[in-house]
A protein has these predicted regions:
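Solvent-exposed alpha-helices and their adjacent loops that cap or buttress functional pockets
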Residues: 9, 18-20, 34-35, 66, ...
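Long, hydrophobic N-terminal alpha-helical segment
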Residues: 1-44
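Aromatic-anchored, charged helix-turn/loop surface patch used as a conserved interaction hotspot
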Residues: 53, 57-82, 89-93
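Glycine-rich, aromatic-bearing surface loops/beta-hairpins
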Residues: 80-141
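Fold-independent oxyanion-binding glycine-rich loops
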Residues: 5, 29-31, 36-38, 45-46, ...
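Gly/Ser/Thr-rich active-site loops/lids in small-molecule metabolic enzymes
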Residues: 11-12, 42-58
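Structural motif
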Residues: 3, 24-27, 41-43, 64-73, ...
Length: 141
């Protein structure tokens, strides 16, 4: 155990977050997300939800302030309602990075973007459309 590090973050994920550089992306996937197909590196967090993992990760990971939207969600398919979890995701992003914009990518472009991500965190989240891409920023003055 380490001080100040959420016990939700397994050692493998902590290493990945440290290895990521400016502009690298990490995907938080829900239980339906094809993580093994998309990710070069997959960290399984099956018993945890996307929002709690997002909260733990954003406590450590700076978001990229040099892009318009360093956070992206998978857009709903036509006719599907807006998922209630989006409000929780937005509130969590706002808590850690006030004013951060969130982009919405259609499903197949989202999958394409996910394939080039540094890593994928597979959660046990059962809410639909609960997938989040985070672009890492920088620390410094």
């Amino acid at each position: 155990m380490l001080k100040g590090i959420s016990p939700l973050i397994p050692p493998e994920l902590l290493k990945i977050l440290a290895e990521m550089g400016h502009g690298d992306e990490i995907v938080l996937g829900d239980a339906n997300f094809p993580a093994a197909t998309m990710g070069k590196r997959v960290v399984r967090c099956d018993g945890l939800g996307v929002v709690e993992m997002l909260d733990a990760i954003l406590a450590l990971l700076p978001l990229d302030t040099y892009v318009d939207a360093p956070v992206a969600l998978m857009a709903t398919t036509a006719g599907d309602p807006e998922p209630p979890i989006w409000k929780e995701i937005a509130a969590t992003v706002e808590k850690h990075a006030p004013g951060t914009q969130i982009a919405f990518n259609e499903r197949f472009p989202y999958y394409d973007r996910s394939r080039s991500a540094f890593a994928v965190v597979q959660t046990g989240e059962t809410a639909l459309y609960a997938n989040v891409i985070l672009k890492k920023g920088v620390i410094g003055k």
